[in-house]
């Protein structure tokens, strides 16, 4: 008798995790690869990345590759899938691949929410290279945000935090802004001496501006002793609070005992200042709210959503969660 399998994918802007899970919750394979966001790669490019990972997973699980679907159900939770039309594009491309009998495509915020709660509802805010939020009410109503950056009113995530550090360092050097230790540590991260040298390197193409994302951990470290860095972290906390507050209000859940889950690489890299500030602000807005980091990785959330649709036992889901939490690589976006 053929074993019933679930295929789970958590695809971010910097990495992709793929897992194969049996109906008993056993994790047969877990592999990691490069980013797969269709926002950057398109639907087919996204699935090319996932397809290569699937081949690796089949090898690890010692499963044959045939023309038959690999899994009965597959859950693809991807950064950059922000509109129904984008979900449809990926769904259409998946039908051609034929990896699963049934597929579910959604934004990666759903993975964080499901990883953090058994309820199936609540609010999740994800801070990775960017920032996003999802709210789900007990009756299934949803609040989502396009999360396209500045054009949809967003600030937050690793890139924005890093660029804010570059901005502050430059203004510290030329006198337009307050003095900050970022003036020294930001260029030093790139083996340069001054913010001016850093600006020249970016301007002349010797250094890609996108590498500003590397500075987020630097900002968190400096925030312990530098006021300007601390203000950047506080600004990020305020953005997380704003997203969660709006989601709660639009779902009429502000006064309810809602779980607010925080996930993503930037949350994992941050210290207690960020989560503490978010928790303090949100519990003032809604005293019954609980705010916590997700204890399980997003790939566990993607797997649990697939297993939900497969109709397996609670024990099987708990096994999958435990195994994925114990063996998943370090969190990222």
Enumerate the predicted regions with their spans.
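ATP-binding/phosphotransfer module of carbohydrate and carboxylate kinases, centering on a glycine-rich
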Residues: 1-65, 70-71, 95-96, 115-121, ...
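Solvent-exposed beta-strand sheet faces enriched in polar/charged residues
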Residues: 77, 106, 259-263
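Phosphate-binding/catalytic loop of phosphoryl-transfer enzymes
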Residues: 81-180, 184, 328-333
